[in-house]
Amino acid sequence: MKSMPVAPIADLRVAQLIDANLDRAREGLRVVEDWCRFGLDREDLVVTLKDWRQRLGRHHHDSYKQARSTATDQGIGLSHPAQQERHEPWHVVAANCARVQEALRVLEEFARQPDPQLAASAAAIRYGLYDLEVTVLQANAGKKRRQQLQACHLCLITTSQSDLANNDLFRTVSAALVAGIDMVQYRNKEASDLQRLTQAKELASLCRKHGALFIVNDRIDLALAVDADGVHLGQDDLPTDVARGLIGSERLLGRSTQFLAQLQKAEAEGCDYLGVGPVNSTATKPERQPIGLAYVKEASKATQLPWFAIGGINISNLEAVRQAGAKRIAVIGAIMNSKDPAATSLQLLEALR
């Protein structure tokens, strides 16, 4: 829709103010738009941001531009120490979302009488940006998690043994995190929900402290309750589309697979990573027949998704698993039952890297 021409504003200061805030809003929208385009690959967000930017452009009449006087603008060249603290792209995006929202609010207030169409557009865009900012935040978190997942080598899955005291659990996981493991999957099928919640909260905190991913096994409700990075599901758990609808696109979704058809199905459904195994017999699931190295070799050729070989892997048989094509492994007993979990974690990491 075309913006109706407006008569020159009698108060030059208001015209200058409108001009400056139109510039500010359009520039800020472009910063966010370019991050959505190049950083997030989100065409849907780019289309919306471009539309808003062009709508404001149609309201940027010559009468506003002609009132511009950069030579006498006391705000030219001003900066703030916080600008030097924007180390991550998201910091830049968040700052520009706030910048646009503030500029739009100023336009609403000062354009209400001289240019009601501009005021209405500014209000509509401001409220839209509040929602879009949340979407960008979630997309950014999801992208960061997936980048971190790509760099993972070693995932520690916790034991379900009911006699493992909290302190022993936390001490073991903490030692492994200090050694440099990339990811922890919380698995405990024997504890009460309250015990699981207590343990998951502490483990999530430890993982955040050490910059590792934290995944909850099976329990989407628990993953959401502790703000985990994702959830890992077995073949008999919720379908992928249902699980994704619950955890959102910003969290990771993993799926265990035992043969190629399951792997291909999980990838097609949109899982972020896969478990491949059990490679060897394991005390965790003694009833499950090990699939050996043949499926590991198949998986290495069948998918570009990150995947973890799992099942009875330890330092003595790891090289054979690597030779079969595995770049990532998930272990339970090798670390959880180790007398020196930090040293064992280091050994495994060195062998993988």
From Swiss-Prot:
GO terms for cellular component: cytoplasm. Its cofactor is Mg(2+). It catalyses: 2-[(2R,5Z)-2-carboxy-4-methylthiazol-5(2H)-ylidene]ethyl phosphate + 4-amino-2-methyl-5-(diphosphooxymethyl)pyrimidine + 2 H(+) = thiamine phosphate + CO2 + diphosphate; 2-(2-carboxy-4-methylthiazol-5-yl)ethyl phosphate + 4-amino-2-methyl-5-(diphosphooxymethyl)pyrimidine + 2 H(+) = thiamine phosphate + CO2 + diphosphate; 4-methyl-5-(2-phosphooxyethyl)-thiazole + 4-amino-2-methyl-5-(diphosphooxymethyl)pyrimidine + H(+) = thiamine phosphate + diphosphate. GO terms for biological process: thiamine biosynthetic process; thiamine diphosphate biosynthetic process. InterPro entries: Aldolase_TIM (IPR013785), ThiamineP_synth_sf (IPR036206), ThiamineP_synth_TenI (IPR022998), ThiD2 (IPR041397), TMP_synthase (IPR034291), TMP_synthase_cyanobac_bac (IPR016229). 4-amino-2-methyl-5-(diphosphooxymethyl)pyrimidine binds at residues 185-189, 217, 256, 285. SUPFAM superfamilies: Thiamin phosphate synthase. Belongs to the thiamine-phosphate synthase family. Condenses 4-methyl-5-(beta-hydroxyethyl)thiazole monophosphate (THZ-P) and 2-methyl-4-amino-5-hydroxymethyl pyrimidine pyrophosphate (HMP-PP) to form thiamine monophosphate (TMP). This is Thiamine-phosphate synthase. It comes from Prochlorococcus marinus (strain MIT 9303).
